[in-house]
Amino acid sequence: MKRRTDPECTAPLKKQKRIGELARHLSSTSDDEPLSSVNHAAKASATSLSGSDSETEGKQPCSDDFKDAFKADSLVEGTSSRYSMYNSVSQRLMAKMGFREGEGLGKYSQGRKDIVETSNQKGRRGLGLTLQGFDQELNVDWRDEPEPNACEQVSWFPECTTEIPDSREMSDWMVVGKRKMVIEDETEFCGEELLHSMLKCKSVFDILDGEEMRRARTRANPYEMIRGVFFLNRAAMKMANMDFVFDRMFTNPLDSSGKPLLKESDIDLLYFADVCAGPGGFSEYVLWRKKWHAKGFGMTLKGPNDFKLEDFYSASSELFEPYYGEGGVDGDGDITRPENINAFRNFVLDNTDRKGVHFVMADGGFSVEGQENLQEILSKQLLLCQFLMALSVVRTGGHFVCKTFDLFTPFSVGLIYLLYCCFERVCLFKPITSRPANSERYVVCKGLKVGIDDVREYLFSVNIKLNQLRNTESDVNLVVPLMVIKGDHEFNDYMIRSNESYCSLQIKALAKIHAFVQDTTLSEPRQAEIRKECLQLWKIPDQARVAPSSSDPKFKFFELIKDTDINIFSYKPTLLTAKTLEKIRPVLEYRCMVSGSEQKFLLGLGKSQIYTWDGRQSDRWVKLDLKTELPRDTLLCVEIVHELKGEGKAQRKISAIHILDVLVLNGSDVREQHFNQRIQLAEKFVKAVSKPSRPDMNPIRVKEVYRLEEMEKIFVRLEMKLIKGSGGTPKLSYTGRDDRHFVPTGVYIVRTVNEPWTMGFSKSNNRKFFYNKKTQKSVYALPTESIAPFHTCYYSRLFWEWGDGFHMRDSQKPQDPDKLSKEDVLSFIQSHNPLGP
C-alpha cells in the first residue's frame, strides 16, 4: 500500500478536493436556479463525492473508490425515472433509506408514494385553507384588455330634442310599489348574460380576505400608481383627470362664443359647490388650480367623513365654506333632509348674487360591505338628492359632475333621463383614475337650461316620499315611466351601450384581479410610465405630499417683498395742510378713503396665523388678536377699526379689518398693478375669504374708494351719533356700505399716476387723457408706464387729518388754524376739477 505522501495518491486527492468544493456549491443552489446550466459531468462528479463522503465517514478514499462512485452516479443520472429531475444526491439519500419507485418508505412500504405538492399558501390564510368557489376558473379572457393609455375619449348622449317636462306632465310619473332588493332581473338596460356574468365575478370576491384582494388590485391596475400625488386623497386626482378630459370646463368655463367666462383680472369669482364630498379632495384640486379666484361652498354629513380642511396642504381651505343645511355650521349635513336642501340652496343663492354656482361636484357614497351587488339600490336616494341639489344651486349655463354606480334599474335611468332633459349635453364617463374593477362612473352635465324649476320641485317631492317610505315594505320604483324612456330611442340606445360597455370592462378587470390573486408573480409593468404620462398631460407636478411648514413672519415678509427697499414701509403720509394743498392740484389723478385708525401691514401665514407690523424696522411682527382667517402668503395694508352698530345701550362694537391696499394675495404679487385694479382684486379676495355662516369671526372689508373730484360723497355719509362710553356727547361718525359706522380720523388721498405722467380732460372729445410732461405726448389709452405701483402710491400718499380741530361748517369756530375745513378742501378741488362742478 502506498503512503499518503506518494505522488500517485496525492494527485487524486487534490482532484477529489476540487470536486468536493464543486459539490458543496451545487448542493446550495436554490430551486429557482436552473440546474441544467451546470455541466453534467461536473454534477455527477460532485454528487458522487458527496455520496462517498457519507458512506466512508472518517476514512480516506482512494482513487479506485472514487472511480466506482462516479460510475454508479452516472448510471443513476441517466435513468428514465420520473424522479430524474432531482439531483443524484437526493436520489442516493432516498436509496439508502430503501426507497423504490412506486412504493412507500417503511418496513411494509406504507409511506407516501406521491410527491409532496408545492405549497399554495397565500397571504395570511390559515395553513392549508382553500376558498371554495374562489379558486375555480372564471373563464374570462382578461389578457385582451386595451393597452393602458393616458388619452381618453368621451361619448355624449345625443342632444335632447324634447321639451323639459313640466309639473303637469310629471304629475303621475312617480310609481310606488313593493321594495325591491334584487338586481339580477334588471335587464331593461343591459343584456341578461352580461349582467349575470358581472354579478358572478363580483360575488367571487365575497369570500376573499380584503387585504389580499387589495394587494392584487394594486398590482393589476395599470393606473394605480397615480394615487393622490400631493393632494389629500385619490378623489382630487379624479377631478383633475375629468377636468382635463372635459377641456377644463369646470375650472375654466367658456361662454357661448367659446371665450373664457372668467378672467383672473375680473372681479367675479368662480363659484362652486361640493356636496357629499368629505374629506374634500375635489375642492382641494379646484382651489389648487384656481387659488383665490374661486370660492367653494360645501355640504356633507357631519362625523368621521366630514371635510378635513386642515389637510388641504396644496390649497387654501380659507376659500372654502362648509354649510350643513338647517342650523348652518351646527347642522348635520344630511342631504336627504328637505330642510337641509332648502337651507343650503338659500345660503348659496344669498352669497352668489342670487345666481347660483358655476358648477356642482358630488362624490357621495357609503360602505355597502357584504352587499356590493345591491349598491345601486341602496344608494338610490343619495343619488336623487345629489341631482336635486345640483338643480337647486347651479346657475343657468352651469355644469354638474356626480358619482354614480351601476345604472341598471329604471329608477336610476329615470334620474339620468331628467338630467338629460335639463342640461344641454350629458354623458356617462369613467375616468382612468377610477379603478376599472368597481362600478363607479360619473355623470357629467354641461350647460343647465332655463326652465328646470318644475323638475327640481318634482325631485323634491320624490325625496319627501322616499323619506316617508323609509323602513317600510314600499318604495318609489319609478320616477320616469319606462314608456317615456324607451320612447326616446337615442337615449335608450346610449344607455344600453354604456351599461354593457362598462359591464364588459368590469368583468375583465375583476377576472384580472382574480388571476393576480392566484398568481402573486403577476404585475403591470407600465404603472410608473403611465403615471408620468398622465401627470404631464393633466399638468399636475410630480411632487410629494408635504405639510406646509410654519414660517417666521419676518422671514416670510422679506420673501414676499423680494428686493424692495425696506425703508419704503416706514414712510409716513404727508399731512394735507394749507401749505401742501397744491399737491392735489391734478385732481383726476387721486383717490381717497376714510380712515378709522392707524395704518398697519398685515401678513397672513394661513388660517389664524396673522401678524401685524407698523412699518418701523425697530418693531416686530405681532400676532393679531382677532378671530379671522387668511390664506397663506398674503400681505395687506390695513387698519383695525372698531365698528359700531346701533346707538345707546343696544350699541354693539366689533373689530374689523379694513383693507387700504394690497401687495400680495395668496402668493400673487399685485403691487405693479393700477391702484384701481388692486382695490378690485382686494374686493374679489374678500368675497373669497368671507364667511357669512360665521358671525363669530371678525369681518374683513375693503375701504370704500372715492374719486377725489367726488369727495363730497363722503360727507353725505357723516353724521353725529351717540357713542357708548363717550359721556353722552355725540361724535362724528362715518357709515359704511354695510350699515356699520365708526369714528373717522381723517381721509387718505392716494395718487394713482406715475411721474412724469399726469391726467387731463379734453372738452372737445369729452374724455380723459394722459399727458407726459417730459415728452409732451398725449394719449387716451392708459400707458403702462403711467401706472403708479404700490410703493409709489404708498410713499406719495397724503393724509387729511380731522381730529378735534376739524370743523364741518364755517359756522363752527376753528380750534386749529393749521387744519383745513371741509369748505377749504372742497372748494380747492372744485376750482381745479377739469370736469367742472
From Swiss-Prot:
Compositionally biased tracts (Basic and acidic residues): 56-66
Biological process (GO), any one: methylation
Motif (Bipartite nuclear localization signal): 2-18
Pfam family, any one: FtsJ
Residue ranges of every copy of the WW domain listed in the record: 751-785
InterPro entries with a match to the protein in the record: G_patch_dom, mRNA_Cap_2O-Ribose_MeTrfase, RNA_MeTrfase_FtsJ_dom, RrmJ-type_MeTrfase, SAM-dependent_MTases_sf, WW_dom
Renumbered residue ranges of the record's region Interaction with POLR2A: 726-834
One GO MF term: mRNA (nucleoside-2'-O-)-methyltransferase activity
Domain RrmJ-type SAM-dependent 2'-O-MTase: residue ranges: 230-449
Root EC class: transferase
Its EC number(s): 2.1.1.57
Function noted in UniProt: S-adenosyl-L-methionine-dependent methyltransferase that mediates mRNA cap1 2'-O-ribose methylation to the 5'-cap structure of mRNAs. Methylates the ribose of the first nucleotide of a m(7)GpppG-capped mRNA and small nuclear RNA (snRNA) to produce m(7)GpppRm (cap1). Displays a preference for cap0 transcripts. Cap1 modification is linked to higher levels of translation. May be involved in the interferon response pathway.
Protein name: Cap-specific mRNA (nucleoside-2'-O-)-methyltransferase 1
Organism expressing this protein natively: Mus musculus
